[in-house]
Amino acid sequence: MTQKWLFSTNHKDIGTLYFMFGAWAGMVGTSMSMIIRAELGQPGTMINDDQLYNVIITAHAFVMIFFMVMPIMIGGFGNWLVPLMIGAPDMAFPRMNNMSFWLLPPSLTLLLMSSVVDNGAGTGWTVYPPLASVIAHSGASVDLAIFSLHLAGVSSILGAINFITTAINMRSNNMTLDQTPLFVWSVAITALLLLLSLPVLAGAITMLLTDRNLNTSFFDPAGGGDPILYQHLFWFFGHPEVYILILPGFGIISHIVCQESGKIESFGTIGMIYAMLSIGLMGFIVWAHHMFTVGMDVDTRAYFTSATMIIAVPTGIKVFSWMATLYGTKFKFNPPLLWALGFIFLFTMGGLTGLVLANSSLDIVLHDTYYVVAHFHYVLSMGAVFAIMGGIIQWYPLFTGLTMNSKWLKIQFTIMFIGVNLTFFPQHFLGLAGMPRRYSDYPDAYTSWNVISSIGSTISITGIIMFILIMWESMIKQRNVFIWTNMSSSTEWLQNNPPAEHSYSELPLINL
């Protein structure tokens, strides 16, 4: 057991470890979000401490981003599926793969420690100085959070090197780049983004660390520094990061849509690849749209507004290509397809509010209100999370050799769909009415929408608990898969069920 799970170099075992870690972190992060919604469920205070409230907000963001979405999407699905889809016996660097995973539990431990020592890191996930400086946050909390980010960053960089090498070098002999499955492309592009953006974050937080402990003044105007420099460095990482969170989801949805529509390939495969590449590369040149309120030149604001809007073009190409793939199909509303349709609809909604926020003049008013919270939760809670749910249901029979109860899954989808929309749709109204983020209390005028939002969060968590029960039921009933009933949309379905410990011991010859 120790050999298998602690020292594993098998991509399937490491993928499973990532899934279990992500599920655990997801439960931690969801618990935090429930505390936030309980606090905001009525006017007046529940926690009685704004610092603690902001610590929970900060930890919720970090846990969900670095320890739930990224490990599940890149580590879980990436490790399991990339080698199977390209006909590789394993990842390019199996031992580095193992190290990538085992850097995450210590990283999460450091993050949770930062919440419980001293007063906690109540900086928001952006960790802006001067709030993150030693004057405003004395004690070890922010330092622990910085070390946590360093570990998570090293883990992601090692993983990125591994995925890029695997996708380039380990493909089947005659599999050309345009025949490479879209999910493999999405993970490779994600890895490229990680490789280019994380070193900048590492630089920024290292400078913050020395500002706090070694008396430097990179971000302190008293010593000739500039806090805006930190914002530029952070968002140069932060914006690609949000595309890192959603790109693997694009790949997952492409596969689900292709398989459920019963077509031989996705509509406009090459266009899909170019769209992902453009989204990834353009993600690096729009970072300052997070900073419209810091007093930038009007020409600078005009550039970042228009560049941000142009990203909507490749995103639109992807959305319409998914719809074109589904065109003419006689739908059987299987659970994975429901999640994919939910993803397409709600991700588009989130994209539209993003287009609103791209306008620098409007963003001056909407910045730091709940409109922004609603926007990014639409693309994360209903984009990334819906893609994860759809992907788990789609490939669960491949990973385990078992089947989940389809009827229950449809009910669970409905509950969760209602829950997340009820949680986040009212937040648009709160934002337009001017309710600011990161405050634990609010004027009575905002009560009704907050009550509805908190009810929605309770419905959502019911849906998540139901999903865990459905998975548990499939495991205790042990309903084995005898044959894949769906048309194989890519090579991972050619495995046994569940796949043998080692796949492709003899390399496959792929004729497409």
UniProtKB/Swiss-Prot annotation:
Fe(II)-heme a binds at residues 60, 377. Pathway: Energy metabolism; oxidative phosphorylation. Ca(2+) binds at residues 39, 44. Its cofactor is heme; Cu cation. Cu cation binds at residues 239, 289-290. Heme a3 binds at residue 375. Binds 2 heme A groups non-covalently per subunit. Binds a copper B center. The keyword Hydrolase does not apply. It is found in: Mitochondrion inner membrane. There is a cross-link at residues 239-243 (1'-histidyl-3'-tyrosine (His-Tyr)). It catalyses: 4 Fe(II)-[cytochrome c] + O2 + 8 H(+)(in) = 4 Fe(III)-[cytochrome c] + 2 H2O + 4 H(+)(out). It is an enzyme of class 7 (translocase). It is a multi-pass membrane protein. Mg(2+) binds at residues 367-368. Its EC number is 7.1.1.9. Belongs to the heme-copper respiratory oxidase family. This is Cytochrome c oxidase subunit 1. It comes from Locusta migratoria (Migratory locust). The gene is COI.
